[in-house]
Amino acid sequence: MSLLTEVETPIRNEWGCRCNDSSDPLVVAASIIGIVHLILWIIDRLFSKSIYRIFKHGLKRGPSTEGVPESMREEYREEQQNAVDADDGHFVSIEL
């Protein structure tokens, strides 16, 4: 029983590929998709934390305050802080 597959065949003491239809557009497209998938997977593994952080929080860190008077900016900051402080009351301390 041989361990050789249909693709791998010994040719004159070397291993070769018996792929006569490798110029088929479907084979070429599948190869390109496979290579792109591999590259994207490697990039994802290397930079996953920074990529997901960008998608989660976006590139901006909040609404633009350009052209807004300082008094309105301060009022907005206070409203945001009050909203955060109000949410603290929703947490329940469970002691076992």
Curated annotation (Swiss-Prot):
Residues 1-22 are virion surface. Residues 61-88 are annotated as: Disordered. The chain crosses the membrane at residues 23-43. InterPro entries: Flu_M2 (IPR002089). GO terms for molecular function: channel activity; proton transmembrane transporter activity. Residues 44-96 are intravirion. It holds the Pfam family Flu_M2. The keyword Lipoprotein applies. It comes from the Viruses. Glycans are attached at N20. The modification Phosphoserine is found at S64, S93. Keywords: Disulfide bond, Glycoprotein, Host cell membrane, Host membrane, Host-virus interaction, Hydrogen ion transport, Inhibition of host autophagy by virus, Ion channel, Ion transport, Lipoprotein, Membrane, Palmitate, Phosphoprotein, Signal-anchor, Transmembrane, Transmembrane helix, Transport, Viral ion channel, Virion. Belongs to the influenza viruses matrix protein M2 family. Homotetramer; composed of two disulfide-linked dimers held together by non-covalent interactions. May interact with matrix protein 1. This is Matrix protein 2. It comes from Influenza A virus (strain A/New Zealand:South Canterbury/35/2000 H1N1). The lineage of its organism: Viruses, Riboviria, Orthornavirae, Negarnaviricota, Polyploviricotina. The gene is M.
